Amino acid sequence: MQATFLVKEAWELLEKSMVYFRGRPVGTVAARDPYVEALNYDQCFMRDFVPCALLFLTNGRSEIVRNFLIETLALQSSDKQMDSFNAGQGLMPASFKVELWDEEQYLTADFGEHAIGRVTPVDSCLWWLILLRAYVKATGDIALAHQPEFQHSIMLILKLCLADRFDMYPTMLVPDGAFMIDRRMGVYGHPLEIQSLFYGALCSARELLTGRRGEFYKQIVNQRLSVLNLHIRQYYWIDLKRLNEIYHFRGEEFGESAINKFNIYPESIPYWLTEWIPETGGYLAGNLGPAQMDFRFFTLGNLMAINSSLASDRESQSIMDLIEQRWQDLVGYM
């Protein structure tokens, strides 16, 4: 009885958070608190709407998700400029809000030019692709994804994500604050959450692309998926066996025969980690780069790696074993 009441109350709160544009629901606001100044919490954030969208889809309420996808697609072509510099065409906004001008409603987007630290959202376009696939799977409305403007949008995102860059890794290099929240969290580099989203977005794009140009992009996507999969599974994985290997690494190795390819220093391993990881558990590291391995456990990155099959079956089981055996540390009383 109590659970039923809580679910009913949750739905009522979700209904009150819905954003309407010209009479149609297009998203949900980040937060509704009448006692706190809104700041930008009165906007609909791309990443924040995704769990709400999945809930709507599982309950057969796909209209709001379809409207969200269409309106954010239109915002993708908005001006993305700060100090006379234009950002990449495939960029999706971090958030948007409904504004009234001359008694007419308009959607205004924030691509990071208003964010704290002025950081561009890297994850928005990745979440958008994943949500588009989820919508198609839930409704069977593949015609929406096959519309020319949607195909063009998918290719713009791929062009942005797969561009040549100064990097030897198949992972995506991103600045701090470019996902989750626009605050410094020590995640500059190749954070797991972005790699998991990147992998899921590439898999989604591969399913949704059509036509001759689509086939061309599928080949590029397939190439990246295979090397990204290998890279994450081989180098990001942490369990007791892997920790023991790192403890025996030698630093400053050079050449093709180097075992310690990322020059990880054994003394950088937190003293508590060997006691914390259970014998049957393991997880994917939070970040990896030259002389840097982030040993923090990032739940969303690991769970998305399972969801997208970026993690192997064995790794997926080990991650779930870790969460189960360290439930109090990771979940607590939530």
Regions found by a protein language model. Name each.
Residues 1-334:
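Acidic, mature catalytic/reactive cores of soluble proteins
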